[in-house]
Each structure stands twice: as structure tokens, then as C-alpha cells.
Design a protein with these regions (language model features):
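Protease-domain processing segments flanking chymotrypsin-fold serine proteases, especially trypsin-like
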Residues: 2-43
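Generic detector of low-complexity/intrinsically disordered segments
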Residues: 5-12, 97-100, 210
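Residue-level detection of beta-strand scaffold positions
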Residues: 10, 120, 174-177
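Small side chains
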Residues: 11, 17, 71, 80, ...
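Active-site region of chymotrypsin-like
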Residues: 26-43, 98-106, 130-209
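Conserved active-site neighborhood of the chymotrypsin/trypsin-like protease fold
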Residues: 34-36, 43-45, 50-124, 128-132, ...
């Protein structure tokens, strides 16, 4: 959730010397929505990250099948429509375009793979919650695993609805897209093992350059 800080101008009042110093309020800060959006359709929801000029990165499995657009919700409450530009099932990455992008921050995409032990923050909209951040560290090196051509394991939590959200480094730069978590089958049920996977920025930049 975005925290807006209201700045109050402080003034001093000295009675004995009849000197009054009055602070003049500064301009009201302009509200800028964060870069992570919620993407929704009739079957469910995921997340996406605005990288500039209305373009949003997300996970390919978040896309709505035959439909070419999804509704989106910004963290400032504004809504709109995002259209599919392209998707890669091999890498589980897709690019969408917002119908309007005024007043929304853009993430700086780093074309690199996070390194072992690096601190990482993962943002998205898990389950019934919105604008959630979880923290962890890079737990392994870049690998091909299951349906993903290139992912990096991290020890932070990713839950359903966070797919397509961003993985950010200590400087706030986008270094990956959340795509899944590892599940262990336990009899008739299953349990998360605490390891999630992200597609690294290096692979994403390779797709964008095609």
C-alpha cells in the first residue's frame, strides 16, 4: 500500500517580542500510482509491472486465453483496460499496453540476472489482498525448470495472484517477474516448500529485443 506523507509547514510565535514567523504551506504533493497493477478478467486475476509508456510486463499464464485484453486496477484506485501485445509461453512472460498511463510510476528494468544471496522484494496482489510486498533472497542460479525456460529460485513467498508482479532489488529496480512457487505433494494435499521462482531481467530483455 502506498503511504502518502503530508508535509506541514511549522511556524514560530514569540509573544514578548511581538515577532511572528508563519510558515507558508508548500504545494500539495502530486499522487503518483506505483508501477505494480492488478490485472483482472472473469476467470481470476494476476499482477503486472509498468515499465514505461504504458507497457506492462506480466506472466504469460496470467493472460486471458482467447481474449485480447484485461481490466487493470492501479493502487490509486484508477481502472482501465490493458491489451495484449505479445506473450511467450516458453518463458512465461507477456507484454501488455495500458489504455492510459498518466500518473503512474514506471519501473527501471535491469537487464541482468540476480546473484546468489541478493536481497529481493516481490510485489503483487495475492489471493484477496492487494499491493503486498514479500521479502527474501536469491536462493540459486538461473536454471530451466518445468514449464520455464529460464528462472531463478528465491526464498521469498509468492502466492496466487502475485504472478506477473515484480521482483525488485535494493535500489528499487525491476530485476525479475514473479511466475510461480514450488509445491510438494503430501498425500491428498500439497504444501508450499517456501521456494518461489522469478524470470530474471536478463531473459526478459532478450525477449523485448526480439
Amino acid at each position: 500500500m502506498k503511504l502518502s506523507l503530508a508535509m506541514l509547514a511549522l511556524g514560530a510565535f514569540v509573544v514578548a517580542g511581538a515577532v511572528v514567523a508563519v510558515g507558508t504551506p508548500g504545494p500539495t504533493p502530486v499522487e503518483i500510482a506505483g508501477p505494480v497493477v492488478k490485472l483482472k478478467d472473469k476467470s481470476g486475476h494476476g499482477s503486472g509491472v509498468h515499465i514505461g509508456n504504458g507497457y506492462v510486463l506480466t506472466a504469460n499464464h496470467v493472460l486471458p486465453g482467447a481474449e485480447k485484453s484485461m481490466a487493470y486496477l492501479r493502487d490509486d484506485g484508477r481502472k482501465g483496460t490493458a491489451k495484449v501485445v505479445w506473450g511467450s509461453a516458453e518463458y512465461d512472460i507477456a507484454l501488455m499496453k495500458l489504455d492510459t498511463y498518466d500518473g503512474i510510476a514506471a519501473s527501471n528494468l535491469e537487464c541482468r540476472a540476480p546473484v546468489m544471496g541478493e536481497a529481493i522484494a516481490m510485489k503483487g496482489n495475492p489471493l484477496i489482498l492487494e499491493n503486498i510486498t514479500t521479502w527474501g533472497r536469491v536462493a540459486g542460479t538461473e536454471i530451466s525448470m518445468g514449464p520455464w525456460a529460464s528462472v531463478i529460485p528465491v526464498d521469498g513467498a509468492i502466492a496466487g495472484g502475485m504472478s506477473g508482479g515484480g521482483a525488485f532489488d535494493a535500489d528499487g529496480d525491476l530485476i525479475g517477474i514473479n511466475v510461480g512457487m514450488m509445491i510438494q505433494q503430501l498425500g491428498l494435499g500439497s504444501s508450499s516448500v517456501g521456494i518461489s521462482v522469478i524470470v530474471p531481467g536478463s531473459a526478459i530483455c532478450g525477449l523485448l529485443a526480439r
